[in-house]
Amino acid sequence: MAPPQHLCGSHLVDALYLVCGDRGFFYNSGIVEQCCHRPCDKFDLQSYCN
């Protein structure tokens, strides 16, 4: 598994598509705080999947 990393903008959206796939995801300001301002991992991203 990849180490936690900072994901912002299009990198964050691409990572969400990769992790969530066909389930889709919801995007709110909380994920920016969690993954852009601080590093996050795959499990953090999964919490935003539908």
Swiss-Prot record:
Sorted UniProt keywords: Carbohydrate metabolism, Disulfide bond, Glucose metabolism, Hormone, Secreted
Q: Which Pfam families match?
A: Insulin (PF00049)
Q: For this chain's UniProt record, which GO biological process terms are given?
A: glucose metabolic process
Q: Where in the cell is it found?
A: Secreted
The protein's matches in CDD domains, at most eight in alphabetical order, are given as:
IlGF_insulin_like (cd04367)
Could you name the Gene Ontology cellular component terms for this entry? extracellular space
Q: List the disulfide bonds.
A: C8-C36, C20-C49, C35-C40
Xref: Gene3D superfamilies: Insulin-like
> Which GO molecular-function terms appear in the entry?
hormone activity
Q: Does the keyword Secreted apply?
A: yes
Q: Does the keyword Secreted apply?
A: yes
What InterPro entries does this protein's entry cite?
Insulin, Insulin-like, Insulin-like_sf, Insulin_CS, Insulin_family
Describe, as the record does, how this protein assembles with itself and its partners: Heterodimer of a B chain and an A chain linked by two disulfide bonds.
User: Would you identify the family this protein belongs to, as annotated?
Assistant: Belongs to the insulin family.
Give the protein's function. Answer: Insulin decreases blood glucose concentration. It increases cell permeability to monosaccharides, amino acids and fatty acids. It accelerates glycolysis, the pentose phosphate cycle, and glycogen synthesis in liver.
Protein's name in the database: Insulin 2
Species name: Batrachoididae sp.
